[in-house]
Amino acid sequence: MPLNKDIKKVLVIGSGPIIIGQAAEFDYSGTQACQALKEEGIEVVLVNSNPATIMTDKEIADKVYLEPLTVEFVEKVIEKERPDSLLAGMGGQTGLNLAVELYEKGILDKYNVKVIGTSIESIKEGEDRELFRDMMNRINQPVIQSEIITDLDAGIAFARKIGYPVIVRPAYTLGGTGGGIANNEEELIETLTSGLQLSTIGQVLLEKSVKGWKEIEYEVMRDSFGNCITVCNMENIDPVGIHTGDSIVVAPSQTLSDKEYQMLRSASIDIINAVGIEGGCNVQFALNPHSFEYAVIEINPRVSRSSALASKATGYPIAKVAAKIALGYGLDEIKNAVTGMTYACFEPSLDYVVVKIPKWPFDKFQGADRVLGTKMMATGEIMAIGSNFEAAFLKGIRSLEIGKYSLEHKKFKDLSMYELRERVVSPDDERIFALAEMLRRGYRIDMVSKITGIDIFFLEKFRWLVEEEQKLKQSTIDDLNREWLLKLKRRGFSDKAIADMLKVSPDEIYRLRDIWHIKPSYKMVDTCGGEFEALSPYYYSTYEQYDEVVVSDNKKVVVIGSGPIRIGQGIEFDYASVHCVMALRKQGIETIVINNNPETVSTDFSISDKLYFEPLTEEDVLNIIDKEKPDGVILQFGGQTAIKLAKFLKEKNIPTLGTTSDQIDLAEDREQFDDLLERLNIARPKGKGVWSLEEGLEEARRLGFPILVRPSFVLGGQGMEITHDEEELTYYLTNAFEKDSKNPILIDKYLMGREIEVDAISDGEDVLVPGIMEHLERAGVHSGDSITMYPAQNISDKIKEDVLDYTKKLALSIGIKGMINIQFIEFEGKLYVIEVNPRASRTVPYISKVSGVPIVDIATRIMLGEKLKDLGYGTGVYKEPELVSVKVPVFSTQKLPNVEVSLGPEMRSTGEVLGVGRNVFEALYKGFVGASMYTGDKGKTILATIKKHDKKEFMELAKDLDKLGYNFIATTGTAKELREAGIDAKEVRRIGEESPNIMDLIKNKEIDLVVNTPTKANDSKRDGFHIRRAAIERNIGVMTSLDTLKALVELQKEGAHNRELEVFNLI
């Protein structure tokens, strides 16, 4: 039992939906913490709104509440469950803010709930900018000259006093939200206004900019006895001025002298002791590169993105140790699971280099401002491990899945030196490639360091890589000898990079490696630099001599993970991968995971029998398969990243379990799939693949507008658009064929019907459909961005029968063994198939949780040869539950400057929440609250700007809203039509007209909800785009689909928002 015998039932607060700044790392830390508590025999009650997480599984906690993370709903859970303790530091900023609010409102006192781990007072000292600054002054730790600001005038006065540039840092926000660097008064007014609005306590720290200093982080652990260690120190390659979540980070630090390292280590320990942290804490410093001057930037008094990275970089389980400390254990009492003999008080030592590179979503947002600053924009990250910096860095580049295997990028070749300089002075996500091009052209390293703030140490490494690339380009395959090839492999060059530069195929390099016996060896991540024997089966590749992998003769299966979190391929695929691993291990099969995402549960070495932290490229995967010789490889759960390897593995005669490469092609190749549908007599929207602009226009004339256009072989609707006329189609096709002329563009007649979705399991003979899901928004909104209801609410029995019939026919005809995801449209009483994915989809965690069917477990067992009829869940459509569950998407567009907000066929959401109720209205209300959507609870003024062919439908909704007490503001045309319909509407001037116009009303927050149906999506020159952006940046609700507005109307008419709602334990 824990040292504190009073702790028997602990409430753990999760972090909610995946958003920029708060991603899968909190599923990893939350899962680890829950397991650590259960190990001690403590009952765990978990509240989290995100259904796509492992931590919300019944195996992880004793009670699981998928409820909105608000004081109101968490109080209901506390009232029902009566926990004696609350663990606050595992749910990111969301969990921390919620714990503070519960404490301040007296709810924790009311129910006698004690906060364990870091106290609320310590959390406040770490989070409140003023308290933290005062504390630093008391313990003589230097902070940057700054002032706490709560109004605009005081901010302007302070900036004038200290001079520009200044940094704006709002209190209690996430990922630098609302902050930024202001170079002049105009920029300050804009950033400060936003920061004060977005801070939960209306407080901002305004500080003198030390942009260009080094940014160094220490991950520190402290127990309640005052024992303290540094787990890991990390160096941002990018200087202060770029958010650490958007920086390339290396561990351990590479450029600090011993004196600097010890100075900052001592400072971090002094800080964590002064604040009184009990558990994990991240301390960030700015270090002057030309002296020993430093300043404390901030601390995170909780587990964080950096602590997930530090855990994976060192093998030290920070969240688990923090949870044990919260129970009263000392660091010297907690065993290190990696060695099995040392304790958590041993500081890890690393004999390798770790590099983290962020993954940005700009492929989804063509018009986005890509310049990096103090506001985080990355959706995810990769981590790479190497025996030297260059090897880890190049592994990192190829892990990003951006089609790059070296530091060469074609788009920078034609830029002038002036243009390249601009790209690194205002750094963006591609700055490394611009910088490499400058070095390639002989730009002086000291000058590059001066303008970028990047240390000369790293620039010299980049220059060496660039020089080797140039040598290769000037050589032929005959010039390559064993010594040179081994040197390149040791420095991280992939076969593909070497082959591209020598203009041969990667197979040719692989053949030479085979002849010359140049094979990777695998080293263990052991936390102790090889000082003690390690038990952790956690490996990275190197081309050094000694290999630490012991290959067994057991039956074994490799599971390919899904790589970094990105829009369209999120945490749902990690959920599926982890469940696949669990199912295999239950069957006694040795399970090997290959993945490169430091945030996820799948890369926790305790999950699988072996973990290879490697890029998911053909070469890196093949090297491991060559080594392990598994009985099979599973690709179905790793999203498109894994599926893309199917053809390659087939060519190499490597067995894949479940659906084969040919079957995947049958589902994804347009012509083959159309032939199959014709044979099965299943309808699909009319259309075809076209290879040229002329052919596309001809097909569009035949089908009639509107037309849905998209590239083949994509994920998350990437590049998909609805075009309404020939001008729009010409613009789209011209751009699409410029990007990719080797594949056709798919053109479909756009049907505006109801969208229906199923995830099904097939064993080749029978099919099980765990549930039929209905999308609230009509077709044309990407399925990942639609509100999804289960059980389906508006589908006739006849259509349900057709859904099952079509699903069976498709699964059996394709030959699916395992999972299949199918999307349908019901249009004018007829069912059409619009998409088939022969793999796990992003709805798998949702439908698994709400139907009670362990989908991944069943699918995995089928891949191993079992039959559906023997697994206890039957066949056909599974019985529907009594409760209604609604999945609501969550967007991070507020954090990305100048990107589109409206819903459309390209996916834009980063996460999701669940709403569970006795009926669909209760579920929707909870979903809206959990997703921080507009619910009408706080204000009832609507700005309506509606396109012509939506006006009739809008008027019907406006009548209902009028009866519900809403006020309308509209531009001349819409206002006139509202008045003609008997609805009072205030007229407002358009953008660009004299004040007060639409923008003034939005800026002054005189509007509570913007209803705007876009005329031309993705056109940032139009007024609608500016209205949507201005609203979202000021936390004003925006709805761009009338279906979403209709849902709001219905739940208000039903009174779901005024009812006393229950909370439900889903176990």
Swiss-Prot record:
Signal peptide (UniProt feature, chain positions): none
Domain of life: Bacteria
Annotated binding of Mg(2+) 1, by residue: Q284, E298
Family: Belongs to the CarB family.
Spans traversing the lipid bilayer: none
Chain residues that bind ATP 2: R710, K749, L751, E755, G780, V781, H782, S783, Q823, E835
Stretches for region Oligomerization domain: 402-549
Pathway involvement of the protein, from the record: Amino-acid biosynthesis; L-arginine biosynthesis; carbamoyl phosphate from bicarbonate: step 1/1; Pyrimidine metabolism; UMP biosynthesis via de novo pathway; (S)-dihydroorotate from bicarbonate: step 1/3
Catalytic activity: hydrogencarbonate + L-glutamine + 2 ATP + H2O = carbamoyl phosphate + L-glutamate + 2 ADP + phosphate + 2 H(+)
Protein name from the UniProt record: Carbamoyl phosphate synthase large chain
One GO term of the biological process aspect: glutamine metabolic process
Organism from which the protein derives: Clostridium perfringens (strain 13 / Type A)
Domain MGS-like: 933-1067
